[in-house]
Amino acid sequence: MAANCERTFIAIKPDGVQRGLVGEIIKRFEQKGFRLVAMKFVHASEDLLKQHYIDLKDRPFYPGLVKYMNSGPVVAMVWEGLNVVKTGRVMLGETNPADSKPGTIRGDFCIQVGRNIIHGSDSVESAQKEISLWFKPAELIDYRSCAHDWVYE
């Protein structure tokens, strides 16, 4: 990984998968210039989801969130690029789709907060934790994109 790059964890939730939005979401990250370094299609276990959402365990919506995330397959991904955590969050839109601007993923494709189709790390530290939870180090593929010099100075 280049010195000025960081990585983020992005997961397309079961509703995003069921609605056929996987390709559109990947396309947006690729077109922005970010590099995909890992991806898997998984039915996340309840234990994995409880670890992933441990910070929310005392919130009233926690049981429903774990059930929803366990209701179908998820596309788990790691993206790399300059300021990818912050920029990725902007691309996703607000957690509540009603507050998301048109042009964002949630602004374009979501209506309710309980079905907001995508998760993105909220900090570099969270990204590192989430990546290590969902992926083994050997699953992160390091390569140089032929588009790199056309995206970065």
Curated annotation (Swiss-Prot):
PANTHER family: NUCLEOSIDE DIPHOSPHATE KINASE. The active site is at 119 (pros-phosphohistidine intermediate). The keyword Transmembrane does not apply. It catalyses: a 2'-deoxyribonucleoside 5'-diphosphate + ATP = a 2'-deoxyribonucleoside 5'-triphosphate + ADP; a ribonucleoside 5'-diphosphate + ATP = a ribonucleoside 5'-triphosphate + ADP. Pfam families: NDK. Keywords: ATP-binding, Cell membrane, Cytoplasm, Kinase, Magnesium, Membrane, Metal-binding, Nucleotide metabolism, Nucleotide-binding, Phosphoprotein, Transferase. The lineage of its organism: Eukaryota, Metazoa, Chordata, Craniata, Vertebrata. Belongs to the NDK family. It comes from Gallus gallus. Its cofactor is Mg(2+). GO terms for molecular function: ATP binding; metal ion binding; nucleoside diphosphate kinase activity. Its EC number is 2.7.4.6. HAMAP family: NDP_kinase. ATP binds at residues 13, 61, 89, 95, 106, 116. This is Nucleoside diphosphate kinase.
